[in-house]
Amino acid sequence: MTSRPAAKSPKPKSPKLSRDVIINAALTFLDREGWDALTINALATQLGTKGPSLYNHVSSLEDLRRTVRMRVIDDILQMLSTVGTGRTRDDAVMTMASSYRSYAHHHPGRYSAFTRMPLGGDDPEYTAASHAAAAPVIDVLASYGLTGEDAFYAALEFWAALHGFVLLEMTGVMDSGMIAPGVGSEAGRVDTDAVFSGMVLRLAAGMAHRNDPGGNP
C-alpha cells in the first residue's frame, strides 16, 4: 500500500495590512535593524508581503518615517507624563531622567528616530509635538519656581545633558568597563548608574537655585 505524502503545513498568514499594523511593525523593525535600514521593501519583507502593498496605506517612505517619529514622540510624552504624575522637584526629575534613559536603551531604534529632526524644523506639527513632549518636564520645573522662558531653557539644558549621557552609553564610550584614573583595578570600574544619578542631582540642584539672586545661573 502506497503511503500518501505528508500534507504540507499551511504557511502562516501575513497580518492584514492597515496603517497601524505597518507603523507598529516599523517600530519593532527600528529597534532590531536601526533607522537607516528602514525602507519600504525591508519593512514589507518583515510583514511577509511586497513593497507595493504598503503604498495602499503609506504614501511614501518619508510619510512612514514621519509617522513613526510622531508615534515615538507621543510614546515619550505619555511615558514622562505617567512617571512624573504626583511627583515634584528632585524626585520627579530623577524618576523622569531614569525612565528616559531606560526608554533609550530598550528602544534604541525608536530613540534614534526621536532625535532625527530638529525641534525648529519646517514641520509645524512635528515641532508642536516635540514641544508637547517637553511639557511634563516643564510642569515639574514649576515646582522649582521656574516658569516661562526660564523653564523652557532649563528643560532644554536638562534634555541636552540626558541625551549626551545616553548617547555616550549607546555608542559604547561610557560603560561599566571604564577604569577610574589612578586606580587601575576592578575596584576602580566606573559605576555608570552612580555617574548618571550624580549628574541628574547636580542638574536638579542648579534648577533649585536658578532664580536665587546669588545662586547659580
Which functions belong to the PLM regions below?
Residues 81-110, 121, 131, 148, ...:
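Hydrophobic alpha-helical connector segments
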Residues 21, 25, 29-63, 67:
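Helix-turn-helix
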Residues 30, 64-72, 114, 122-133:
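Alpha-helical DNA-contacting segments of helix-turn-helix folds
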Residues 105-122, 167-178:
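Amphipathic alpha-helical segments used for helix-helix packing
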Residues 120-145, 152-156, 189-205:
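Amphipathic alpha-helical packing segments from all-alpha helical-bundle domains
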Residues 1-17, 182, 211-217:
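N-terminal intrinsically disordered/low-complexity leader segments
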Residues 50-52, 56, 64-83, 87:
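A glycine-rich, hydrophobic loop/mini-helix early in the fold
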Residues 160-180, 205-213:
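Amphipathic C-terminal alpha-helical segment
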